[in-house]
C-alpha cells in the first residue's frame, strides 16, 4: 500500500511562526507561505501567525502552537545569514535541532522553513526570486504532512 498526503488544505488549521530578525526576507517568506496555503484551500481564518524576535526564539512558540491542539501543522520561517563570528553556527544548529524535535514530541508536523545562508543574496534568492520561495514550499509541505500524518491518527 502507498500512503501519500494530498494537497487540498480545506478544513486544515495552520500555525506559522516567523522570526522578525531579517524581516526584509522573512516577510517575503511569510507572503509565500500564506499564498501557498490559500492557493491550496486553507481559509485565511484558519491561519494564525506569530512573530518572534528572531530565529532562536522560533522553537518555543512553535512547540506551544503544536501542543495547543488547535493546529494540524505548524510552519517555522526565519532567516539566519552568516556574519563574521561563530554566532551563525550556534543559532542555525539550535534552531534546526529545536524544530526537528518538535514533530516527534508533539505528533504534529512542524515544518522547517528557516533559511540558513552564507550571504544576503542567497537569502533573497530563496525568498521569491531565482530559487523560488521557501515559504511557499513550506506551506505545501505542511499541507501534505498534515494529511499524511492523519492517516495514522
Swiss-Prot record:
GO cellular component: cytosol; riboflavin synthase complex
Pathway the protein acts in: Cofactor biosynthesis; riboflavin biosynthesis; riboflavin from 2-hydroxy-3-oxobutyl phosphate and 5-amino-6-(D-ribitylamino)uracil: step 1/2
Single biological process term from Gene Ontology: riboflavin biosynthetic process
GO molecular function per UniProt: 6,7-dimethyl-8-ribityllumazine synthase activity
Keyword S-adenosyl-L-methionine: no
Signal peptide range in chain numbering: none
Record-listed (2S)-2-hydroxy-3-oxobutyl phosphate binding positions: 84-85, 126
Keyword Transferase carried by entry: yes
Binding positions for 5-amino-6-(D-ribitylamino)uracil per the UniProt entry: 21, 55-57, 79-81, 112
Top-rank taxon: Bacteria
Keyword tags: Riboflavin biosynthesis, Transferase
Catalytic activity: (2S)-2-hydroxy-3-oxobutyl phosphate + 5-amino-6-(D-ribitylamino)uracil = 6,7-dimethyl-8-(1-D-ribityl)lumazine + phosphate + 2 H2O + H(+)
Active site (catalytic residues): 87
Family: Belongs to the DMRL synthase family.
Annotated HAMAP family: Lumazine_synth
This protein's name: 6,7-dimethyl-8-ribityllumazine synthase
Organism, as annotated: Bacillus cereus (strain AH187)
Name of encoding gene: ribH
Amino acid at each position: 500500500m502507498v500512503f501519500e498526503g494530498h494537497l487540498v488544505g480545506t478544513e486544515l488549521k495552520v500555525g506559522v511562526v516567523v522570526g522578525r530578525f531579517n524581516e526584509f526576507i522573512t516577510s517575503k517568506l511569510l507572503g509565500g507561505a500564506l499564498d501557498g496555503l490559500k492557493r491550496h484551500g486553507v481559509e485565511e481564518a484558519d491561519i494564525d501567525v506569530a512573530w518572534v524576535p528572531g530565529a532562536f526564539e522560533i522553537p518555543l512558540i512553535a512547540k506551544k502552537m503544536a501542543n495547543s491542539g488547535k493546529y494540524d501543522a505548524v510552519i517555522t520561517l526565519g532567516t539566519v545569514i552568516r556574519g563574521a563570528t561563530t554566532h551563525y553556527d550556534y543559532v542555525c544548529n539550535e534552531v534546526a535541532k529545536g524544530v526537528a524535535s518538535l514533530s516527534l514530541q508533539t505528533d504534529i508536523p512542524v515544518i522547517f522553513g528557516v533559511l540558513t545562508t552564507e550571504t544576503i543574496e542567497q537569502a533573497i534568492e530563496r525568498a521569491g526570486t531565482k530559487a523560488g520561495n521557501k515559504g511557499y514550499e513550506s506551506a505545501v509541505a505542511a499541507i501534505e504532512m498534515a494529511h499524511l500524518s492523519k492517516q495514522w491518527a
